[in-house]
Amino acid sequence: MRLALLGHPNCGKTALFNLLTGSRQKVANYAGVTVERKEGVLTSPAGKTVRVLDLPGAYSLNALSADEAVTRDVVTGQRAGEAAPDLLVCVVDATKLQLGLRMVLEARAMGLPMVVAMNMSDAVRRQGIAIDRALLERELRMPVVETVGIRKDGASALVQWLDGWQPAGGAQASAWQPQGPAQVLQTQQEVRRILRLAVREPE
């Protein structure tokens, strides 16, 4: 099974990648560009072998940089020599949920199997912010698991979920169409709606 970690810069994605793969990783460049390619291997407690790809950080699939273009092409299966992932793990920073959910909604539109890794969930609790994970799952229509990339056991819930997940087979990304201004606005409005429902700030 191949999974790809998708997320914006500084969301804790690479820390989570290191936690999942340990020293079993290989670093190179994508062909034709000076963008780093990081892949590792996770062996789950149940013995499942998972190839983990740490995609370049991206704020949106509407690519504005070489890093974002590589990420978009890998996710959509358009990158030469790179098989499309079986599963997208969309890593979001729980303390900056608005930033991460935009990417989640963009990626969801392509119809690939997805799970959200809500990283830094411990930090958000320390701030007195309550996130209704079950409600978030319902609104996003995908599983949401809590992770803490800087803690030794911080990926245990994600690994447990991966152990129980089985690819449906035949899943292919829909063709990616860059969002126009109206679609970007619609996505932003949907993110705000979900946040109003799922997040309770301290009084």
Functional labels for PLM-detected ranges:
Residues 1-66, 78, 82, 87:
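Conserved G1/Walker A P-loop phosphate-binding module
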Residues 32, 36, 65-68, 72, ...:
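Amphipathic alpha-helical transducer elements in NTP-driven molecular machines
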Residues 32, 57-60, 94-98, 120-125, ...:
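Conserved nucleotide-binding/hydrolysis micro-motifs of P-loop NTPases
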Residues 42-47, 70-145:
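Conserved C-terminal guanine-recognition region of P-loop GTPase G domains, centered on the G4
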Residues 61, 93, 148, 177-184:
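Hydrophobic alpha-helical scaffolding
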Residues 122-176:
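Canonical P-loop GTPase G-domain recognition
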Residues 167-203:
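Cytosolic regulatory modules rich in charged/polar residues
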